[in-house]
């Protein structure tokens, strides 16, 4: 098959002479009327097989959804199951092309149509498509059957190779068809689908170039791969229409005509400059619809509508620009399953929006989907809510070779083709561990081939010394760079149950109490933990830890020197049915629980992250609640970006808080008195800039119910859901923060109770008896395929009961097909507004450059301590007399601060003296850290600074529970696993050093 490329550029609007035709493609919702059987039934591929006893389901639907959060990840059932569906095509589909698109199956699947095998798909992650045209029976019933095996140890049939990402740590095994399925009916001259898996086609590619943000202009490009499956030549014209979010057509332009031979595949292109554009941005999900159409003899024969957005990016100098404004990455490393109790990952599109927009509400700007490619539904959701994404392909905790590496490159290729029109994807990630330079170059070539104009950086975790990477960053440590940006990929692994406020509150869980052992999903054995505290925190200490850990990255933000941190993502947003170390059988590192009820750290991040780099909107939050016994005297913690915070109790000032880590204010020994606790923040001029309060609630009196649902209403398609929120309130309608009452629910009408989660037997999964925790809980309720009114009643001992009703609306399904496309009517959210045109940060520090250095030993390696490479170091020879190094500066300066990354940063405290010329400007022991130490020195005019070890450094790990899943290796510069890494003698070892002048004295 030949492949040609035709291109035509129009700088102005094209004037179309075409006549609109209705003879265009149809996209059908193919989720309805599926039948499910758990177990291998080989005869099920035959169309006449009797499936009348099989379970009726609406997709997306994992066969083991009931196990989500009831079982730990490694216990999720893996087996063989079959899905079948009976359907008929409309009469006008005859002589057309018919394709089926599965957004994903888990893990390996054989596909049959009317008894004929049409293909195999095995990676368990990506979408796959099949051409059903040769097998379709027009005017008759058709049967599609899918045999799926979700074995944890599934191996590729042709090679016997296991997929690296089929992993019991991070990739929750919700087996079957947990994603959407679509049916496409097109003309025989058509634009292909972006389904390289099996179909080997690339579809439509939309992108912008020459973006001028201030003048709102760009050149919009469209490219469509088209194929002619007629038995004669076709002369084709190509047209592009750009439609804004209000449905207004703002520009139409055309490409050249082309003659496409039978069986030929070509690519048509067109481009035009467009004015008055709205650029997609953080918290500004402005999307356009781009309609690309094919015309023959003045008749439209095919049209594809692509929903996309346009934005400008740049990566360099250790920083990231979005629409010409520097942005520091602040967000979450979320499990790609993004799962919920009782249903797993298979939720409606509006609920994906609810969850993902909650990140934006918390002022996150980035979600890093972990280890495998995210579901298309989540990708499109992030487009709508304005949340930047890092898109993985597939991996585990290490680089690999041979067929496993080929599996990774193939998945990256397919994922890029499928998702390259989604503006929220700004990063392509090639691995959850460093990959080789050769592998990085190979992945980069894939990006350059299939998405050369998308404005996306491609990189991998680590990549500290591989300049071909366009971004990188470690998992737990602080990295800085003056070349490609570095952001931390999974910081702060601590866990805390939402139920536990603090030591002083019911149920009086002591901070850190929990088992000192857990079942490792790596070894499948029970392992001892030296210290369980960080995995069983109360909410107050969990919040403080999150503040401390973010401060490490904020301190190195753009504007603080030449080498900066581009931020980081905290590991997981919502509690997850994956690898855990705490008491419960699921991970509780989220800033929300699994039902997306915020914990205190959610609001702490909302305070700290409200700005592109520097804080732009002062905020304040009091950690915890204000309902205690009269004898309680406790610290009160306030999170604020204000310069000073004052606390008031019932109008009386309790003074100003003690400030730590820039954002944390502590008020010690506050005696509880019922009433109103207020915190007021002041700016540097003493003017009030933010205020918040807590109010003591009365005794529990009543239950309150409310719904959270789609803006489209509740659809009776068997897949749509609503969130039922239940709260225990006092007589005045205030939530009771210590209520943990068991609520008994009754459901009447066409609905299925999927429930919520709470601490207790089986985590209360699917139970209609569900306790509130801290006065609140939520439950999922799924529609049936019958519409009607649903009434829910909630009762509890000693509380006034409540009831609430909701009516589901019918969804038309005819012969297994529906024109209702969930998510199509969901609008982009514009909550943060367009990208500001003001600078995102003030320059607070400038570096004084280093010209050269001499040392007591290893002079040839002194440059390693200022080479912008955190995998190199200078070290002396271990003798006291050689434990010094002198740096010559590019100019005489009054240095205010010395910033260093010292080898063994988490293990060692170095006793140092620092001299400006011969004058001592600092003496002391450096702190242990997760990266850099900052030493405020006496500012003395000099062009020469000496660092000298003044004694034996002190060893011992200060961060023993901050560890990865995979074991670190002994030769890493943190010395965490090095033999005698904490025994340093007279070693002086420097990874990077910087000398800074403070401009904000």
Regions found by a protein language model. Name each.
Residues 298, 353-359, 365-601, 605-608, ...:
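Substrate-binding/catalytic cleft of secreted carbohydrate-active enzymes
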Residues 222-226, 293, 636-639, 680, ...:
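Beta-strand-rich structural segments
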Residues 22-103, 158-170, 174-177, 185-189, ...:
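Extended carbohydrate-recognition surfaces in non-catalytic/accessory domains of CAZymes
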Residues 215-258, 634-653, 676-681, 740-743, ...:
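Beta-strand-rich binding/interaction modules
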Residues 28, 40, 78-197, 388-390, ...:
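Accessory beta-strand-rich segments of carbohydrate-active enzymes
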Residues 118, 138, 143-185, 279-291, ...:
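Glycine/proline-rich low-complexity spacer/linker segments in large multi-domain proteins
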Residues 61-89, 93-102, 106-114, 119-122, ...:
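Active-site-adjacent substrate/metal-binding segments within catalytic domains
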Residues 51-60, 113, 823-895, 901-907, ...:
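Disordered, acidic Ser/Thr/Pro-rich linker "stalks" and the adjacent N-terminal cap
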